[in-house]
Amino acid sequence: RFKKIRRLGALPGLTSKRPRSGSDLKNQLRSGKRSQYRIRLEEKQKLRFHYGLTERQLLKYVHIAGKAKGSTGQILLQLLEMRLDNILFRLGMASTNPGARQLVNHRHILVNGRIVDIPSYRCKPRDIITTKNKQKSKALIQNFIASSPHQEELPNHLTIDPFQYKGLVNQIIDSKWIGLKINELLVVEYYSRQT
């Protein structure tokens, strides 16, 4: 993880750690001139590692975004942001995307009153995300919510009730709330040149 954030910069979905300010300067000095391919590859890797996706999963999302109407890059980010594991991370119910994925896989999370154990489940507006009534589930979420540093910076497409361990998806995310310095068009270009 530390090698990844040193090379690609801060990835809040992967880890809460940040690269040291000097390491970024060293990377620029050491790397010399960066090719266009390398720049596109790094942007793609940022997206992959932030959301914790495999190459195949990301490629699938790029194909879905390409078929939809509108800007492919914006739609790609919206698809990734509306994943259940990422919504849990944004709500502060998990400290990282891998942590959120584990909560979902271990069946601690309910969407609209039903257990969902698929981290890639696509949330829709008006979905209500809660924890199971078991003490263990509530204790896990309570620890994350209490230690969540971005509680006051909750995106406007989400609402959380920390006392009832409940989150609400109000709408599809606006791109300014992504919180990741990324040029999504370079990711789309990377895949368009691969085929």
Curated annotation (Swiss-Prot):
Claim: Plastid is one of the keywords in the record: yes
UniProtKB keywords: Chloroplast, Plastid, Ribonucleoprotein, Ribosomal protein, RNA-binding, rRNA-binding
S4 RNA-binding domain segment(s): 82-143
GO biological process: ribosomal small subunit biogenesis; translation
Residue stretches in coiled coil: none
Broad class of the protein's primary localization: plastid
GO cellular component: a single term: small ribosomal subunit
Places the protein is found: Plastid, Chloroplast
GO molecular function: rRNA binding; structural constituent of ribosome
NCBIfam families: PRK05327.1, rpsD_bact
Family label: Belongs to the universal ribosomal protein uS4 family.
Function: One of the primary rRNA binding proteins, it binds directly to 16S rRNA where it nucleates assembly of the body of the 30S subunit. With S5 and S12 plays an important role in translational accuracy.
Cited PANTHER family: 30S 40S RIBOSOMAL PROTEIN (PTHR11831), SMALL RIBOSOMAL SUBUNIT PROTEIN US4M (PTHR11831:SF4)
Subunit and interaction comment: Part of the 30S ribosomal subunit. Contacts protein S5. The interaction surface between S4 and S5 is involved in control of translational fidelity.
Descriptive protein name: Small ribosomal subunit protein uS4c
Organism of this sequence: Romulea revelieri
Lineage: Eukaryota, Viridiplantae, Streptophyta, Embryophyta, Tracheophyta
Gene: rps4
